[in-house]
């Protein structure tokens, strides 16, 4: 083992060495990226750095060229706190305390120098600039197949991104404090997050048509006494998928690294070896052969021995059940100490004290597991190299994947829960599966004579019971014109017809047809009723048959199927066939249940509810923006009430009930610096208003519901279902006025808890122009509406200056300016 402290391997500008927060090595082992307080990302060559681990006589002659980084990127405006290469080495994701996530992509080809500036050997471009976090980004992790990217930060959020398009898929606000670490399962089933709320949450995700996420388990026991003074909680998942190592845990008064077992999520094992809280834990990406020379009584997980007999027996059981492989993990933190552990030992392989002068921030292994990169707040990048076999005998990388087969790494368990028995049954079923016979798309859709296509109509009654003809294969002779008379055939009505010649054999004479007995029928029809033959099959001996029958509706139906409506009219009724009668009855039921033709797709219920609210009748609508957080307020500076609305899903999926129950809308109320209201709604809030007179909040949802909450969180009235989307809410004295997208007014008296007006249509005063042709054009909009102070009647002001009052006694709108005739509703 060698420890390299290279003086030029830093983030230095002038005389200052900036703190380094993150380091990561690409999966091909060629590049290492670092980021720090200077806001720059530097990419180094791993091979050039490891050259200095060899004797000095073997160093290259011009070693100064090796001391320069391959690239310097400075697009962040703050400190770079997280870096991760994608598993396919195509992208580099970087996060900063400027709340921005950048996706970098290496530009191929030579880089042109600019003026007299030093030229980088590599040039990386920013492909995407992603803005979604409200605070510092603390950690980044890619899925093993690069399909998903997850970022966490100090805003308590977990954001899932698409790994190819980099669109935001989901946002979780399930932690109650800063989220400081995230890691993916190498079997591509879970990802785990660590937070300052002293919990580790394990998320399970399914890859189907849409990604779905569920919280599998929440671990709290090892972190109940963990301090909140660490910069990071960078956890790691073992390459065999069995364990998660989480730093900054405690075992009584001792600072430890918790080891979480997969499946039952047991936390009885912990690594005791640090005097102060740990910041990072990182597993070696390689697995090693199990060493039988170690003491058999030591626990496999490389932890402190538990005094209970149950823990000892579980450790021995894991030793027997394991596939005889060991994994190696490195841990470091605020005590400036690096400890390297093996799952076959209870004590560390080695401990390097005072390796740095300040806290260690990040650790990264090379892909072959022979080198370790370590960063710290003193601005150093320390490299530790190991000789071959020093950590153990590494097994081939192919066997790493075999260790993950027990968890279904090459399968997508979409329906059934993960279990070993299920995977064993799948392997047995695969052995008995019939081999797949490759066929072209045309042949598989057309069928054969023995297996007619399902689109071919079957007659209900067969007059002639003729055996199926089998045409032997024959080589087609050279194309030449047929000599002699054409084939003549006599059909059932006595008329003579010219038999067509088979196109596939050119102008050759028709092949001799050989009849086979019924026993030679395809075995697929053995258990079914004998199929009825078409009358054309009766001429099999006289007319040449095509090898592949064409469908009745044409060749184009092979590409895009056509559903026949009322298909029973093509059949002849057969009293003797009960099965056919049942089929016809089913088809008639399907025909009756078909939906009628819709003339206006905009008025269908699905379209009305899924579209955005219609705002064309309002000059100033009150729909809140489709953002992650929306702030509403009422009152003055001395008595200010604030409501924070966090919709759990976006408007595009606002009617996905499953997504809403998993991520409900969160309502938070604040007054004088204290939280006074906290509620969860399984609906998307689209409008909100606060009433100072009644000290309450009115919330309208996309499903046509109205919630009225008091300032202290109580629901004043049960949920009010209007059935229309409310696009503007107004609080006037102790009244709440709602205006819907269908131009209807609703008025409630909150103090008296009663409905004042309902379904008052404003269309009679909106539509003043005569309709032309079949289209009605509305040239005015509603500018404002309120209640009259003296009569408590509804007043509506238009954009053209006109105003109208709703007369409750008359049941109509009246003009407030002139003495015109009342406009009836």
Curated annotation (Swiss-Prot):
Keyword set includes Oxidoreductase: no
Q: Which UniProt keywords apply?
A: Chromatin regulator, Nucleus, Repeat, Repressor, Transcription, Transcription regulation, WD repeat
What molecular function terms (GO) are annotated for this protein? DNA binding; identical protein binding; nucleosome binding; transcription corepressor activity
What are the BP-aspect GO terms? chromatin remodeling; intein-mediated protein splicing; negative regulation of chromatin organization; negative regulation of transcription by RNA polymerase II; negative regulation of transcription by RNA polymerase III; nucleosome assembly; transcription elongation by RNA polymerase II
Does the record carry Protein transport as a key word? no
Q: Where in the cell is it found?
A: Nucleus
Which InterPro entries does its entry note?
Answer: CAF1B_HIR1_beta-prop, HIR1-like, HIRA-like_C, HIRA_B_motif, Intein_N, WD40/YVTN_repeat-like_dom_sf, WD40_repeat_dom_sf, WD40_rpt
Which Pfam families has this protein been placed in? Answer: Beta-prop_CAF1B_HIR1, Hira, HIRA_B
UniProt region (Disordered), positions on chain: 294-320, 574-595
- Biased composition of type Basic and acidic residues is found at 294-304
Its cellular-component GO annotations read: chromatin; chromosome, centromeric region; HIR complex; nucleus
Gene3D superfamilies per record? YVTN repeat-like/Quinoprotein amine dehydrogenase
Where along the chain is composition biased (Acidic residues)? 574-591
| WD repeat residue numbers | 15-54, 75-114, 132-171, 174-213, 227-270, 309-351, 355-396
Q: Which family does it belong to?
A: Belongs to the WD repeat HIR1 family.
Q: What does this protein do?
A: Required for replication-independent chromatin assembly and for the periodic repression of histone gene transcription during the cell cycle.
PANTHER family xref list = MEMBER OF THE HIR1 FAMILY OF WD-REPEAT PROTEINS (PTHR13831), PROTEIN HIRA (PTHR13831:SF0)
UniProt name for this protein: Protein HIR1
